[in-house]
Amino acid sequence: VAIRSRVPAEAYTRAVLAEGEARASAFSGRQLVSAYFGGGTPSLWGAVGVGEVIAGIRRWFPSRREDLEITLEMNPAEASEACLAAYREVGVTRLSLGLQSLSDASLERLYRNHSGADGLAALERALRAGFSSVSADLLFGLPDQSLDDWTDDLTRVAATGVPHLSIYHLTVEARTGLERAVSDGRLRLPTEDVAASQWEAI
């Protein structure tokens, strides 16, 4: 994994716009229903770049829909009031917030850069920010996560009134720090019975 101290946002924006221009004609005549900025942490891109691409999308795919849905995935660590407002201003209508867990211990095991309190506060800010919809991501099957840990996450997130939850079972990716920690016994994944109970608790 290559880590840069600064995200090359301008170069990436130019590349996305160039590819959009090159491919748009292949979809001419189709009605655009939604656009999704996902696949990692697009909130690191910045509202200016996202806004330029949204403008490009509207230019390439003119839509008569007033309710065109444009979703952005965001890490709670980036979800300040100013950042949320900036994305709303450039046309993002729906926010998907990657909470993953509200347990500090679980978040540390996942190498996340926010705490449970940070995540909950970010969700509450997002719900106040004026998006047409907000979604939160949660993971179960986490290392050393009990059924009680999982139901606590579900209960606390549901209590915010968030209209949509995306729930996933953890996938341990190859050649990651998490895989190494599981392989050498430093972390233990829940048994199949515990994971099944977590699924049933949903």
Segments (PLM) and residue ranges:
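C-terminal scaffold of the Radical SAM
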Residues: A2-A26, R30-I202
